[in-house]
Regions:
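Conserved adenylation A10 loop of the ANL superfamily
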Residues: 116-130, 246
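Short acidic, glycine/Ser/Thr-rich loop/turn "cap" segments at secondary-structure junctions
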Residues: 101-105, 125-133, 204-207, 228
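Mid-sequence acidic-hydrophobic segments that form the walls
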Residues: 122, 149, 249, 253
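Long, hydrophobic, well-ordered secondary-structure blocks that form the structural core
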Residues: 130, 135-140, 341, 347-349
Length: 573
C-alpha cells in the first residue's frame, strides 16, 4: 500500500499546520478511504507526525488559563515542552477540573468543555475526565478508523441481512453542576460508530440509548433481541466476559425467552420503565417459526449452542490483552473454530490510544494523529521519557500522554509492551496498570511477570488455567495463588512445586527471600468451576455492569471456603 499512502494537499496542510483548523477537524472532513490513507501515511512518519500533533495541541490551548501560565505560545520544541512541564497525574489537575465541571471555560484548553467521561471507578469514586471539542473529534476518529479496519478484516459483517450485537454502556449518565454531559468511554464509542455499522445493530436505538435500566433487565433484553435474530454474524464489546455470562443466562432463561420470541412480547417478570416497554414492544413482531426452531435445537442439543442458533456467527471484537486474554481463550472453546477475534482497542476515559489492524492480535498502532505520546521505561529511576520513534521491541513502558482535552504529560499509570517495530513505528499492547505488582522487601513481581510464570508452568504440565488471582499473606509472609483450572484432574501439588521453582529461577530476589526464610513456600488454592464468573457479578460497582468490570489479579482476601476445592501446601498431600 506504499503507493497509496502519499500525502495530498490536505495532508500537506496537516503537516505544515493550518491557521483555522485543527488536525482532528481536517481529518474529520475526509471520506473514509482518504481517512485510512491519511492515517497510514501519518503512521509512516511518526517523528514528524508527533511533532505536528504536539504543536497543534499547544496551539489549541495557548489562550487557556493553563496555557498562558505555562507559556504554550513560546514552546517551540519537544525539549522545550518536556523541560517546562513535569509529568502529572489526576491530583495535579483536579482543581482545574472542578472549575470545568462548574461550566467555566478556557481553563485547560481554549473554549468550553464539550463533555466529561467517567472513569471505571476502581477505587469506588469515579473521576471525571474533561473532553474538549477536539478531544471528542479524536476519539470519534479513532472509533471510525477502528470500525473501518474491522470491516476490512471481517467483510462478512457487511453482508446483506447480517446483524451485529454491540454490548455498550450508556452514552450519558447525567450532567455536572454546570450542565455538562457525563458519559462512558464505551458508550461514546457506540455513538461514534459509522452509520453503516449502526444500521447493522441487532439492538434497537431505544434500548441502546436507554438510561436507568437495571443490569438484570438489560441483560435479558440483550439476549432476547440477539436470540430472535438468526442472522447474527458477530459481537462487539469491550469485555467478552459479559457475552460469556449472557450465553449462560440465555440457557438458564430459555423457556421465558422463547415464549417472548413466539409472542413478540417482553416478559412481565422484567422490570423496565412502562414507556420504554411500550416503545420496544410496539416494534417487536411475533415469530413462532424462530421460537420453534430454537426449541428444536434445545431439545436435540440440550443447550442453545452458538453454532446452531447463529449459523453465520463469524466475528468477535473485544479486549484481548492483559487479564482479558484468558477469558478470550475460554470463550473460544464455546465458539466455532472459524470465528475471527479482533482486538477492541486499548483505551480509557482519558483517550483511545491504539488502532488494531490485524486479526487475532491484541496489539495495535498508536493513534499518532490524536495524542502526543511519551514513554517511561519500566524500572527507570528517572523521569526521562522516550518518544514513539525511540521505542524498543520487547520492552515495557509506562504511558505518558498529552491530549487535546487538557491532559499534559499525564501519566496514565498503564504499562504497555512493544510487540514489534516496523520503520520506527511500534505496535503496542496494554499489559497492566503500574500499580499491579507484589512487593516484599526487595522483591517486586509485576502482573505480567506472574502471568508469564503461570503460563509457562501451564504449558509445561499441560494444565490449562481458566482464571487466576494471587495475594500476599503479609501476616504469614507467603504468596497464595488461586487457580480455576479447566480439568478436574488438575494436579495442584505438582503445579505448586513447579511454579515455586520457576519463580526462584526467574527472580533472584524471590530465591533470596526463600533461602533467608523471609518468605515461606507459596501455596496454591484450587477454586470451583465458575468462580471467575461469580466474581464478575459480585464485583460490579453501583451503576456499572459486567462490560465495565475488570477483575483484579492481585487481591487482598482469601476466597470463601465454599469456593475452595483443594489447597496445596509444602509438605502436605
Amino acid at each position: 500500500m506504499a503507493e497509496e499512502r502519499k500525502p495530498d494537499e490536505i495532508l500537506n496542510a496537516i503537516l505544515a499546520g493550518s491557521e483555522d483548523k485543527s488536525i482532528p477537524e481536517l481529518l474529520k472532513e475526509m471520506p473514509n478511504e482518504k481517512l485510512i490513507k491519511s492515517f497510514y501515511y501519518m503512521e509512516s512518519i511518526p517523528e514528524v507526525t508527533q511533532m505536528r500533533v504536539l504543536q497543534d495541541i499547544l496551539k489549541s490551548a495557548q489562550n487557556s488559563e493553563f496555557g498562558k501560565k505555562m507559556g504554550f505560545a513560546e514552546l517551540k520544541s519537544v525539549d522545550d515542552f518536556r523541560n517546562k512541564l513535569p509529568i502529572s497525574d489526576y491530583s495535579q489537575v483536579e482543581a482545574e477540573i472542578e472549575k470545568l465541571k462548574a461550566g467555566t471555560g478556557d481553563i485547560l484548553f481554549d473554549g468550553a468543555t464539550a463533555s466529561f467521561i467517567a472513569t471505571s471507578g476502581s477505587t469506588g469514586i469515579p473521576k471525571l475526565i474533561p473532553e474538549s471539542k477536539n478531544g471528542q473529534l479524536v476519539k470519534g476518529l479513532v472509533s471510525q478508523i477502528r470500525a473501518i479496519l474491522l470491516l476490512m478484516l471481517a467483510p462478512e459483517v457487511m453482508a446483506a441481512g447480517k446483524k451485529v450485537l454491540a454490548i455498550a454502556n450508556p452514552s450519558e449518565y447525567g450532567r455536572t453542576a454546570g450542565g455538562i454531559a457525563i458519559g462512558s468511554a464505551s458508550g461514546q464509542a457506540a455513538k461514534d460508530m459509522p452509520t453503516e455499522m449502526l444500521k447493522k445493530m441487532v439492538l434497537p436505538p431505544a434500548m441502546m440509548m436507554a438510561k436507568e435500566v437495571s443490569n438484570e433487565a438489560t441483560d435479558y433484553l440483550t439476549i432476547r433481541y440477539a436470540l430472535a435474530e438468526k442472522n447474527l454474524v458477530g459481537v462487539v464489546c469491550s469485555n467478552i466476559a459479559h457475552f460469556n455470562i449472557l450465553l449462560k443466562k440465555m440457557n438458564a432463561q430459555a423457556a421465558e425467552l422463547l415464549a417472548d420470541i413466539r409472542t413478540g412480547q417482553i416478559s412481565a417478570s422484567i422490570t423496565i420503565d412502562p414507556s420504554l416497554r411500550e416503545k420496544l414492544v410496539s416494534e417487536l413482531v411475533a415469530d413462532p417459526e424462530r421460537a420453534a426452531e430454537l426449541e428444536t435445537i434445545l431439545e436435540n442439543k440440550k443447550t442453545l449452542d452458538v453454532a446452531a442458533i447463529w449459523p453465520d456467527f463469524a466475528v468477535v471484537s473485544c479486549w484481548m490483552s492483559a487479564s482479558a486474554a484468558k477469558i478470550v481463550a475460554d470463550i473460544k472453546k464455546q465458539l466455532p473454530q472459524t470465528v475471527k477475534f479482533l482486538e477492541w482497542g486499548y483505551g480509557a476515559s482519558e483517550g483511545k490510544f491504539n488502532i488494531p489492524d490485524k486479526a487475532q492480535d491484541p496489539a495495535g498502532l498508536p493513534a499518532l494523529f490524536g495524542y502526543f505520546f511519551e514513554f517511561l521505561p519500566v524500572g527507570a529511576t528517572h523521569n526521562q521519557t522516550v518518544l514513539v520513534h525511540e521505542l524498543e521491541k520487547g520492552c515495557y513502558y509506562e504511558l505518558i500522554i498529552t491530549s487535546y482535552s487538557g491532559l499534559y504529560r499525564y501519566n496514565m499509570k498503564d504499562i504497555v509492551y512493544v510487540t514489534e517495530i516496523n520503520n520506527q513505528l511500534p505496535r503496542l499492547v496494554f499489559v497492566c496498570k503500574e500499580s499491579e505488582k507484589l512487593q516484599v522487601q526487595q522483591l517486586q513481581l509485576r502482573v505480567y511477570e506472574i502471568d508469564g510464570a503461570i503460563q509457562t508452568i501451564s504449558d509445561r504440565l499441560n494444565h490449562e488455567i481458566r482464571f487466576y488471582q494471587v495475594l500476599l499473606d503479609q501476616e504469614n509472609n507467603k504468596l497464595i495463588f488461586m487457580l480455576e483450572p479447566y480439568s478436574e484432574r488438575f494436579d495442584s501439588d505438582s503445579f505448586r512445586v513447579s511454579l515455586e521453582q520457576h519463580l526462584a529461577e526467574i527472580n533472584p530476589s524471590y530465591q533470596q527471600l526463600r533461602v533467608a526464610q523471609q518468605l515461606w513456600p507459596a501455596e496454591l488454592i484450587v477454586v470451583r468451576d465458575g468462580y471467575r464468573d461469580s466474581l464478575f457479578t459480585r464485583s460490579i460497582m453501583p451503576g456499572k455492569n459486567v462490560n465495565q468490570t475488570k477483575l483484579k489479579t492481585i487481591v487482598s482476601e482469601y476466597p470463601d471456603s465454599s469456593s475452595i476445592v483443594d489447597w496445596a501446601k509444602e509438605g502436605e498431600k
